């Protein structure tokens, strides 16, 4: 049988679920994830810990399902909404991920709308 893996990096937890060919949930595993608040209005996530959480929940879900990773034919990934996750040329995170609840950049879209940048970027 072929299996499918869903991976969800939500705002408060990371979850992995294994489904069979009929769409039946075979196994699920999850864990809470920490939000970093280095300053008021800043919300971030440690990218290395996020990677470790993903690996852990995938490992647990596959183990609970009683299958091997080779039996998974497709992986679907979703997340918490908007955010910024920067990777360097060395395939390492440049900095902590910035979460959608972070307020430090709220003024940029307002400024871009006023000065015409938004219109230029989305010209058809």
Protein language model annotation of sequence segments:
Residues 1-96, 106-107, 111:
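N-terminal glycine/serine-rich phosphate-binding loop of ATP-dependent small-molecule kinases
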Residues 101-124:
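Glycine-rich phosphate-binding loop plus the immediately following alpha-helix
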């Amino acid at each position: 049988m072929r299996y499918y893996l869903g991976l969800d990096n939500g705002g408060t937890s990371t979850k992995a679920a294994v489904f069979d060919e009929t769409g039946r949930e075979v196994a699920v595993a999850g864990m809470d994830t920490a939000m970093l608040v280095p300053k008021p209005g800043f919300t971030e996530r440690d990218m290395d810990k996020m990677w470790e959480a993903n690996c852990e929940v995938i490992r647990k879900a596959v183990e609970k399902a009683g299958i091997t990773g080779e039996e998974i034919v497709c992986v679907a990934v979703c997340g918490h909404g908007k955010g910024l996750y920067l990777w360097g040329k060395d395939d390492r995170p440049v900095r902590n991920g910035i979460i959608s609840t972070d307020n430090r950049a709220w003024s940029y879209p307002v400024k871009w709308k006023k000065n015409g940048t938004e219109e230029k970027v989305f010209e058809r």
